[in-house]
């Protein structure tokens, strides 16, 4: 896959908000925060959006930047700043932790939005609809790398019709489908819904290995789903893990030399 021409990206940070209190990241968290941090530094327009009670909202730019930088420091670099958890908690309480749901109405493109079903109209907050309208002639992408909240068909319809967005998902695995005995009851059905939505709505799927790619293709064929373009985006190793490995090797080497020296003394 060649470089994409991206004028604007709508990156889904719902999982990052939901996982804000986790002291350490899971594998999916690591991918999610890396992509979010990467987009934060890019020159093109980016909006960080989240899902709450089946509705998509847009995070204020400063809030999104603070969320991503705090989690990146906490999970990746371990440079945890003072009051990190308190700040993350405050962001959470003002977003998906907020019990009040105030969905605003869109101001533009009434000719399109007036044709939405009640479910589609509720799926995207009016202020986000206005952003989709404003940038609809740009090369826009909705990106979700976390599995979190995937399957929101009404919202995807709005994204594609109002915003003319292309949709990209990252599929990490289909373990809950292949091995339901190893997951919580119901997780296999939930993941089937997610993967089906990826097949039906995505313009491109990112996977972490050729095996995941092959299993996704098989899943699509078995269920008579379309097979969208699939691209392997291999996952690297965190610098901190490499550093720890090198330190461990050095320590073993030093201990071995010390042991040899002691034995020679005897």
Regions found by a protein language model. Give the residues of each.
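Carbohydrate transferase catalytic cores enriched for Leloir-type hexosyltransferases
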Residues: 1-266
């Amino acid at each position: 896959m060649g470089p994409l021409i991206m004028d604007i990206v709508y990156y889904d940070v719902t999982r990052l908000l939901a996982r804000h209190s986790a002291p350490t990241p899971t594998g999916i968290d690591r991918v999610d925060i890396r992509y979010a941090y990467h987009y934060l530094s890019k020159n093109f327009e980016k909006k960080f959006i989240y899902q709450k009670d089946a509705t998509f909202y847009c995070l204020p730019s400063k809030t999104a930047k603070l969320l991503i930088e705090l989690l990146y420091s906490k999970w990746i670099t371990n440079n945890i700043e003072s009051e990190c958890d308190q700040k993350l908690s405050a962001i959470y309480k003002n977003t998906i932790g907020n019990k009040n749901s105030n969905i605003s109405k869109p101001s533009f493109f009434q000719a399109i939005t007036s044709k939405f079903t009640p479910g589609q109209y509720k799926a995207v907050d009016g202020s986000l609809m206005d952003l989709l309208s404003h940038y609809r002639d740009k090369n826009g992408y909705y990106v979700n790398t976390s599995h979190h909240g995937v399957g929101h068909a009404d919202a995807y319809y709005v994204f594609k019709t109002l915003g003319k967005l292309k949709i990209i998902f990252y599929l990490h695995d289909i373990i809950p489908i292949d091995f339901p005995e190893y997951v919580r009851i119901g997780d296999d059905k939930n993941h089937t819904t997610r993967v089906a939505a990826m097949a039906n709505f995505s313009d491109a799927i990112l996977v972490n290995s050729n095996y995941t790619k092959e299993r996704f293709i098989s899943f699509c064929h078995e269920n008579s789903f379309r097979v969208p373009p699939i691209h392997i985006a291999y996952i690297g190793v965190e610098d901190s893990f490499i550093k720890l490995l090198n330190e461990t090797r050095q320590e073993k080497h030093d201990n071995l030399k010390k042991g040899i020296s002691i034995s020679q003394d005897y």
